[in-house]
Amino acid sequence: MDFPGSEPTVGLEWEVALIDPETLDLVPRAGELLDLMDEVYPGHRVTREFMANTVEMVTTVHGNIPAAVEDLREQLLQLLDCADRIGVLLFSAGTHPFTNWGDQEMSDKKSYQEIIERTQYWGRQMIIWGIHVHVGVGSKEKVWPIINAVMTHYPHVLAMSASSPAWEGLDTGYASNRTLLYQQLPTAGIPYQFASWDEWEEFNRDQDRSGVINHTGSMHFDVRPSKYGTIEVRFADSTMAIWEVAAISAYLHCLVVYFERMYDAGEELPSLQQWHVAENKWRAARYGLKALIITDRETTERMVTDELRRWVEELSPLAEELGCKAELQDVLRLIETGGDYARQRAAARAAGAALEPGVRTRGDAGAEEGFTQPRAWRAAVELTARTLRETARD
């Protein structure tokens, strides 16, 4: 794998879904929407995705977060315009809270069909949406020390973005059920702690010889190097507001640059034992912003919100230099909201759900237990779609 290296530029990818305005369920109309986008906004950068209910906004390379977010905003406004014209709504979260995954249609792209053929049941359940953040790194020798350092902040980023508490009408008890779903795929999940670029290349040769890459196109680790000379962070849930995307992206931009400068200064970069990384991932997926996380190799524990506040302060001078101080400060605003997963639960609760983790909620009065599209979770979908639209210009 070539890694050309680059300046600390940024690029963002944001997956969103299409829903019916009446049923609020997912609809497989991405092809129709993109055909209209081609007609109305020729040259747009919105792309097809794994499922026929999904589109992805992809920015060009930018020097700072505000420029990248404005690029996303332009695409979001174009999508909202075309979605209105064909009569669908946009929805942005880690998962849809009540849809039946078995009813969803896949895109007809050959590589996607091959993935489904290989992964079967679990692959068909990938009704999930995320945010991917690319940050440029100067050389391949720096990549894995920086990735291993970024993994110490896995729970920080996941807790901020967590927005998938429900699945098929079930309150899972998790802040990010998307995280638990995605790791079922054989090439997804926490990357191995490679000590060098040579180890990474040896690993890829093994995957190529064994046919793994032939089936999947690439490894889908939660964080990975990309052919563009960037580190790609892939594990954040999609959020309901663009300012949240900006806050999470600013945090990651600052973090990668912070660790690259440590490397350049000859300082030892932080890392955690693989088992601590896995535990932190689970804790953030389960508890979101209420997670108690492991912060060092001595197994010190702190609340993730306390750690986020500490790191916002630590990164603020760098954020000012990188032009994203306001976006980084919005991490504190995000903490105050309680997280998208909590807002979805609150909306469902206000609509009358009996939200006991692991117990299916009721729909209309008299509906039997186990009804998979409860009226209560419709309120969470309405909140998410409304917030996405209302904050698109913020």
UniProtKB/Swiss-Prot annotation:
User: Enzyme class, one word?
Assistant: ligase
Signal peptide residues are none
For this protein, the Enzyme Commission number is 6.3.2.2
- Which reactions are catalysed by this chain? L-cysteine + L-glutamate + ATP = gamma-L-glutamyl-L-cysteine + ADP + phosphate + H(+)
Q: Which GO terms describe its molecular function?
A: ATP binding; glutamate-cysteine ligase activity
| Pfam families reported in the protein's UniProt record | GCS2 (PF04107)
Q: Name one GO biological process term.
A: modified amino acid biosynthetic process
User: Which controlled-vocabulary keywords does the entry list?
Assistant: ATP-binding, Ligase, Nucleotide-binding
Question: What's the domain of life for this entry?
Answer: Bacteria
Q: What SUPFAM superfamilies is this protein classified in?
A: Glutamine synthetase/guanido kinase (SSF55931)
Q: Which family does it belong to?
A: Belongs to the glutamate--cysteine ligase type 2 family. YbdK subfamily.
Role noted for this protein: ATP-dependent carboxylate-amine ligase which exhibits weak glutamate--cysteine ligase activity.
Instruction: State the name under which the record lists this protein.
Output: Putative glutamate--cysteine ligase 2
Q: Which organism is it from?
A: Corynebacterium urealyticum (strain ATCC 43042 / DSM 7109)
